[in-house]
């Protein structure tokens, strides 16, 4: 088994019972693949597939002018390299994007030859089409300097859907069936039955009309309509009664309305008897061809065809007319013998279309189309052209209507056609097929569709959403181009004169900047990033709304299995509308979710893995991943639990066709990180998976001792860690840079064989948490491709580490852990276990005002020297300064207009003669409630404005860092070159050289070492070939130096050019403050099982409950939090964590007494290989075993995968191994070694019962009391009501609401109440009065009129009611 560089350092013992058959796919693949298909940037222009940008261009172009003599054709498009890299865009507040240029061709035809088009001239040109934001390698976008994510949307797939109203519309509870054809874009077409069984259609939810109008509009006559929907009964008219052609199926089950006889007149069925199978057999036996029916049997029947008098050509009766006695008389008079009527019955052949045809008043195709025109455009006169154009545009025009590939596939599948391709517009037979199926449904045949089935909902990813926006922009451009194309020839215009890219840019900008699906990335920790990118939302444009979404849409559906996680979804109004992709889920070409299964043939599991969509899955019998299998892969149980079409059942192994890939297949990333998930209640698991996303990265991340084995995948795929692009040797490493000399076999010829990784240091995330990377390699380490070189936030040795492992005791403690409160030891705070760093960004801009420019300066009047002491000569705070609320960070003055002086000021001015400065202090100060250390400052200056010293210094530092990187690369390149040179030169004969090298001397190593490397090139070699090689190496080194100098110049140019700032801004300064947050009462904490609580007290170490060996507990939790919540997983985690730590202590004890390496190996083998998945420890060298043991001292990490985790027996074994009898006795453990005797820290007395003690991975969540604590004395007031604002962000007050008023009324505190409702709230005059009274020492309140009363009076007056206050 192959271990990576980091895995060797610390192996996680897995309790999994099944081998890994399918690796978890790359977690961000959905986003990255979708966007790369949209751009197709690396595909040559001629080989691009018709998807993404290419599809958008080809769907809109060519654009033809109104007169048809000029057209604009699309040739290809190209994307330029982005001007700034991702980091520069974030610093400067820019969008990371690329310019899109399209090559278009303007073709002008000769107007003189109207019959045959002759090309007069062709102009080809590249035209700028706007900027397209680019995706970062981690699947996000940088828009205006902030990282955003485009969430995928789950929407109803295009196609045709049949449903009924579940009997809710009509009072009788009758099921009303309906069908809807949904295109990707274009008009929706609905068909619906009303309670009277008339079939209607409507376009785009407008007024409904009888469906036969639509059928006539597509060219069918009433006869054809009836022939399409009914079978006919054939009658031969006699002088009395008639003969009915005998069709057995149509008679069975009917009640005979007359005696039915055979040919010989023998009665086979008596009148009023029900016709059964025996009667039919008798009639068939008698070879009956016709049945004689009486006259009244014909009355009320409906004619299927027009009946025409053969001689006169006169129409006697129309199709769909009922037969009456007068009609029969006319038929007999005209000598017509044969007639056809519609066959209908009450059971499975209703007369719906016939009834609809009666309601329909239109006569022919034209009338039907006019009726549709009137419905779509009420009030407009229907001219013939307009009517035709509108009808054709509705469903038949490719510009206005697009079913899409998916829609056509779904449509054809639903109406039972074999081929899945076809035209993208609606065809006449499509409409007919839909109506036929709907009528069949009403007749009781077939099933309605389930709209929550994942075969009927598809995912729209970034690429598709962006393509739709881009197309919308192009369509706007098309309209403008059409107008101008007419003038193209006369005014000799070029393509760039025709195309204005503004509409495209604005459509794209609006989508990425403010669409509902473009969200501010949740960057609290690596898990929250991954989850955000794997999220699937049913909301957004073209989706559902929170208010309209019912229970069914939100519910878990059987087809979610392995596609969408049944656990992870938000609590609250969005529950079930926002979901997360399951671990192995993946999208197929149509956008439907697929999940992998192992193929099973004749009860034997193969290695073949097939991805099935929800529709395909319904056809197979699928076993679960935990089905018992022998070594050959045969299913061993007699009956296997399996699923078919959403139903679970037990079947024999030979019926199984597929099997799940892994037990964790059904859950998402966040849920699969919860150990013992199978023992938690679903609601708590939901909270657990949501709260892991809110865990704040700790100062020193610590891996969970009990994990699930998915932690490494999660950390690596999130992009928080640094991975090696290529293998090699670590050449240099410090806190901020890692330099790797690449292996020769991986280096590309002619390229620099050096990889330099600049680590991210103390950077602010979107949520103000700290992103910091720490190297985990040493100089000289050999690394392979994909190895983790540096840890990021919340990762430890390449594994996700969201919290800390805490020693937990489940026991009450003086009521301090009542109702989920958490009691924490002071030691946890002292050791900085949960200390986190938060970084705040504060901005100040100097603008150009009407009165003159604002200035950033140190020269500010009325400021104490203490305040100015932190600012440098440019007026900007020093890095490293510790600042409190109210301190000045950047000095800024704004010119102010001439002010009117008060008489006192005039007097002072006259005496002292000082002209008051005409600027006011508008410096950037630290906001209230914040303090910290300045860790970075960035200064941006507009083009053409002199940079201050600080800005220049920042640029110089950046260039210095860049030069360091280049020097490192050069050093390694030159080192390699000189090594090759030395190997080549030693032993060669020289013709002369430096240091008086004689001709014919053989060069040796000592001579070369004595010479400066650059003088080696001065050696003249006798061998011409070697001399040429020497020259080539010299040239390649000089070439590299030249390249590096060019790169440095490029960087310098980029840094020294002015910054792009918003209009009117001259200078912008960003100051970054690092705030250290220690754990304190009021902070929210949680485990991974939804067991959340608030810290109630931090207790001194000496008062905490402790064990017999003096070790105090870190956290005391209330045992009552477990049973009612049913999340027993936390207790199991504590037990296994206890074993993990115990094993670590035993290994530590062995290392301390310097036990033999064999003993260590034997103990490690016992841990790793006696149960669960075996590890290959024999492949480790002694040094590696030693390093492994050192890393295991703090606890052997365990992995208990979801649904395939540690059993009770395995846990008991591990506890026995961790706590031999002597240790167990010393700690006074119970026999199963998971409870310990604890002693009260205050009295030293042992507690009466043993206590469950162990280690749990505990998280600190992003709900910190520091961010919520807030107080106000005076502050801003609302303009209209004059009441204080609300909320911390507005520095608002606390609302004194209705209930609080009742409380004061109950106490009879009338004056307090009056004060609350007037001077403390919105009585403006009263407020000033109170202040004056207090200054005078007169403590009296004169309450005036509350402003809200005045607002009420104004509102009543606005209703037209005159109201006045009677002040008497």
Swiss-Prot record:
GO annotation, cellular component aspect: DNA-directed RNA polymerase complex
GO molecular function, one term: ribonucleoside binding
E.C. no: 2.7.7.6
InterPro entries with a match to the protein in the record: DNA-dir_RNA_pol_bsu_ext_1_sf (IPR042107), DNA-dir_RNA_pol_bsu_external_1 (IPR019462), DNA-dir_RNA_pol_su2 (IPR015712), DNA-dir_RNAP_su2_dom (IPR007120), DNA-dir_RNAP_su2_hyb_sf (IPR037033), RNA_pol_bsu_bac (IPR010243), RNA_pol_bsu_CS (IPR007121), RNA_pol_bsu_protrusion (IPR007644)
PROSITE patterns the UniProt entry points to: RNA_POL_BETA
Entry keywords, A to Z: DNA-directed RNA polymerase, Nucleotidyltransferase, Transcription, Transferase
Keyword Transcription included in the entry's annotation: yes
GO terms for biological process, alphabetical: DNA-templated transcription
CDD domains, sorted: RNA_pol_B_RPB2
SUPFAM superfamilies: beta and beta-prime subunits of DNA dependent RNA-polymerase
Catalyzed reactions per annotation: RNA(n) + a ribonucleoside 5'-triphosphate = RNA(n+1) + diphosphate
PANTHER family tied to this protein: DNA-DIRECTED RNA POLYMERASE I SUBUNIT 2
Function summary: DNA-dependent RNA polymerase catalyzes the transcription of DNA into RNA using the four ribonucleoside triphosphates as substrates.
Sequence similarity: Belongs to the RNA polymerase beta chain family.
Classification via NCBIfam families: PRK00405.1, rpoB
Oligomeric and partner information: The RNAP catalytic core consists of 2 alpha, 1 beta, 1 beta' and 1 omega subunit. When a sigma factor is associated with the core the holoenzyme is formed, which can initiate transcription.
The name this protein goes by in its record: DNA-directed RNA polymerase subunit beta
Organism: Burkholderia multivorans (strain ATCC 17616 / 249)
Gene: rpoB
């Amino acid at each position: 088994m192959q271990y990576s560089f980091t895995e060797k350092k610390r192996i996680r013992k897995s309790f999994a019972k099944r081998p890994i058959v399918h690796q978890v796919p790359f977690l961000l693949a959905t986003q990255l693949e979708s966007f790369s298909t949209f751009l197709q940037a690396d595909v040559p222009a001629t080989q691009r597939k018709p998807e993404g940008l290419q599809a958008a261009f080809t769907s809109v172009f060519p654009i033809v002018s109104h007169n048809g003599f000029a057209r604009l054709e699309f040739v290809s498009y190209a994307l330029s390299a982005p001007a700034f890299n991702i980091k520069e865009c974030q610093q400067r507040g820019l969008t990371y994007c690329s310019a899109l240029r399209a090559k278009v061709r303007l073709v002008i035809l000769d107007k003189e030859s109207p019959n045959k088009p002759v090309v007069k001239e062709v102009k080809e040109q590249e035209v700028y089409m706007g900027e397209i934001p680019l995706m970062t390698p981690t699947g996000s976008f940088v828009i205006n300097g902030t990282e955003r994510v485009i969430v995928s949307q789950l929407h109803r797939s295009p196609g045709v859907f049949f449903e009924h109203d579940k009997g809710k519309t009509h009072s009788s509870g009758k099921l009303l069936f309906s069908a809807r054809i949904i295109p990707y874009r274009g008009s929706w077409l609905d068909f619906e039955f009303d309670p009277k069984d008339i079939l209607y259609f409507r376009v785009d939810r407008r007024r409904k009309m009888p469906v036969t109008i639509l059928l006539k509009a597509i060219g069918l006559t009433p006869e054809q309509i009836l022939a399409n929907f009914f079978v006919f009964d054939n009658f031969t008219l006699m002088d009395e009664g008639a003969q009915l052609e005998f069709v057995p199926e149509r008679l069975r089950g009917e009640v005979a309305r007359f005696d039915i006889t055979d040919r010989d007149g023998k009665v086979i069925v008596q009148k009023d008897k029900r016709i059964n199978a025996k009667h039919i057999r008798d009639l068939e036996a008698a070879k009956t061809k016709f049945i004689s029916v009486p006259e009244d049997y014909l009355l009320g029947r409906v004619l299927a065809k027009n009946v025409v008098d053969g001689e006169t050509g006169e129409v006697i009766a129309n199709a769909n007319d009922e037969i009456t006695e007068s009609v029969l008389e006319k038929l007999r008079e005209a000598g017509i013998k044969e007639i056809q009527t519609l066959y209908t019955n009450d059971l499975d052949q209703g007369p719906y279309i016939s009834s609809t045809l009666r309601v329909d008043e239109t006569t022919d195709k034209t009338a039907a189309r006019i009726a549709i025109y009137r419905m779509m455009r009420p009030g407009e006169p229907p001219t013939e052209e307009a009517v035709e154009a509108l009808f054709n545009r509705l469903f038949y025009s490719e510009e206005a209507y697009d079913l899409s590939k998916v829609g056509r596939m779904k449509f054809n599948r639903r109406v039972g056609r074999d081929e899945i391709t076809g035209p993208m517009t609606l065809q006449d037979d499509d409409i007919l097929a839909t109506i036929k199926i709907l009528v069949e449904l009403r007749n009781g045949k077939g099933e309605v569709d389930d709209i929550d089935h994942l075969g009927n909902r598809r995912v729209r990813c970034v690429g598709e959403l962006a393509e739709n926006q881009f197309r919308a922009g192009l369509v706007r451009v098309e309209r403008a181009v059409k107008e101008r194309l007419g003038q193209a020839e006369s005014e000799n215009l070029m393509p760039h004169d025709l195309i204005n890219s503004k509409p495209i840019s604005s459509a794209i900008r609006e989508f990425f900047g403010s669409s509902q699906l473009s969200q501010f990335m949740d960057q609290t920790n690596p898990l929250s990033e991954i989850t955000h990118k794997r999220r699937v939302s049913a909301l957004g444009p073209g989706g559902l709304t929170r208010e309209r979404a019912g229970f069914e849409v939100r519910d878990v559906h059987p087809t979610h299995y392995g596609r969408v996680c049944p656990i992870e979804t938000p609590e609250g109004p969005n529950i079930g509308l926002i979901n997360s992709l399951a671990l192995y889920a993946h999208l197929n070409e149509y956008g439907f979710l697929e999940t992998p299964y192992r193929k099973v043939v004749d009860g034997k599991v193969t290695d073949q893995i097939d991805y099935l969509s929800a529709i395909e899955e319904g056809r197979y019998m699928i076993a679960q991943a935990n089905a018992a299998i022998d070594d050959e892969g045969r299913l061993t149980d007699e009956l296997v639990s399996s699923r078919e079409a959403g139903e679970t059942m037990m079947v024999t192994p030979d019926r199984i066709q597929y099997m799940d890939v892994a037990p964790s297949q059904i859950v998402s990333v966040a849920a699969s990180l919860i150990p013992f998930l199978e023992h938690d209640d679903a609601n708590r698991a939901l909270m657990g998976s949501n709260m892991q996303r809110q865990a704040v990265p700790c100062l020193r991340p610590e891996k969970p001792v009990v994990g699930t084995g998915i932690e490494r995948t999660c950390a690596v795929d999130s992009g928080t860690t640094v991975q090696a692009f290529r293998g090699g040797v670590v050449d240099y490493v410090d806190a901020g840079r890692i330099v790797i000399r690449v292996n020769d076999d991986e280096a590309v010829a002619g390229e620099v064989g050096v990889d330099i990784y600049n680590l991210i240091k103390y950077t602010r995330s979107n949520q103000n948490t700290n992103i910091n990377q720490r190297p985990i390699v040493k100089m000289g380490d050999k690394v392979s491709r994909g190895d983790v070189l540096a840890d990021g936030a919340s990762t430890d040795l390449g594994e996700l580490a969201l919290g800390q492992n805490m020693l937990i005791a489940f026991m009450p403690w003086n009521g301090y852990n009542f109702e989920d409160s958490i009691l924490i030891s002071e030691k946890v705070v002292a050791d900085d276990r949960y200390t986190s760093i938060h970084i705040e960004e504060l901005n100040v801009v100097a603008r150009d005002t009407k009165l003159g420019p604002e200035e950033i300066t140190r020269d500010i009047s009325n400021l104490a020297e203490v305040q100015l002491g932190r600012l440098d000569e440019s007026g900007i705070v020093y890095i490293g300064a510790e600042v409190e609320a109210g301190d000045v960070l950047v000095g800024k003055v704004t010119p102010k207009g001439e002010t009117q002086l008060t008489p006192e000021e005039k007097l002072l001015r006259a005496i002292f003669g000082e002209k008051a400065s005409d600027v006011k202090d508008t410096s950037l100060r630290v906001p209230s409630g914040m303090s910290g250390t300045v860790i970075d400052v960035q200064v941006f200056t507009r083009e053409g404005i002199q940079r201050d010293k600080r800005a220049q210094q920042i640029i110089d530092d950046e260039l210095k860092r860049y030069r360091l990187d280049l020097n490192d690369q050069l050093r390694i390149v030159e080192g390699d070159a000189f090594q090759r040179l030395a190997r080549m030169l030693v032993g060669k004969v020289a013709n002369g050289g430096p240091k008086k090298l004689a001709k014919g001397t053989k060069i040796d190593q000592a001579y070369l070492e004595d010479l400066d490397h650059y003088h080696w090139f001065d050696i003249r070699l006798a061998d011409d070939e070697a001399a040429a090689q020497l020259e080539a190496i010299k040239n390649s080194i000089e070439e590299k130096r030249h390249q590096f100098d060019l790169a440095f110049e490029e960087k310098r140019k980029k840094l020294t050019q002015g910054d792009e700032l918003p209009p009117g801004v001259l200078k912008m300064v960003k100051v970054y403050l690092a705030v250290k947050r220690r754990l304190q009462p009021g902070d929210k904490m949680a485990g991974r099982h939804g067991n959340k609580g608030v810290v109630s007290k931090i207790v001194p170490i000496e008062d905490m409950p402790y064990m017999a060996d003096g070790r105090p507990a870190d956290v005391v939790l209330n045992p009552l939090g477990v049973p009612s919540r049913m999340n027993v997983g936390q207790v199991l985690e504590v037990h296994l964590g206890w074993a993990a730590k115990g094993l670590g202590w035993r290994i530590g004890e062995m290392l301390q007494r310097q036990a033999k390496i064999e003993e260590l190996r034997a103990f490690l083998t016992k841990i790793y290989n006696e149960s669960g998945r075996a590890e290959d420890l024999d492949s480790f060298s002694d040094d590696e075993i030693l390093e492994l043991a050192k890393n295991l001292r703090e606890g052997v990490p365990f992995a208990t995968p979801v649904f395939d985790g540690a059993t009770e027996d395995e846990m008991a074994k591990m506890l026995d191994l961790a706590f031999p009898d002597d240790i167990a006795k010393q700690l006074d453990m119970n026999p199963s070694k998971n409870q310990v005797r604890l002693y009260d820290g205050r009295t030293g007395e042992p507690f009466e019962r043993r206590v469950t003690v162990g280690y749990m991975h505990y998280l600190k969540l992003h709900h910190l009391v520091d961010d919520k604590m807030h107080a106000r004395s005076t502050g801003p007031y609302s303009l209209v009501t004059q009441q204080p604002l609300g909320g911390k962000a507005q520095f608002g007050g606390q609302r004194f609401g209705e209930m609080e008023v009742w409380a004061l009324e109950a106490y009879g505190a009338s004056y307090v109440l009056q004060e609350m409702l007037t001077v403390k709230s919105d009585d403006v005059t009263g407020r000033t009065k109170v202040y004056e009274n207090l200054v005078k020492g007169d403590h009296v309140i004169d309450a005036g009129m509350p402003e809200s009363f005045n607002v009420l009076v104004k509102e009543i007056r606005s209703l037209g009611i005159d109201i006045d206050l009677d002040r008497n």
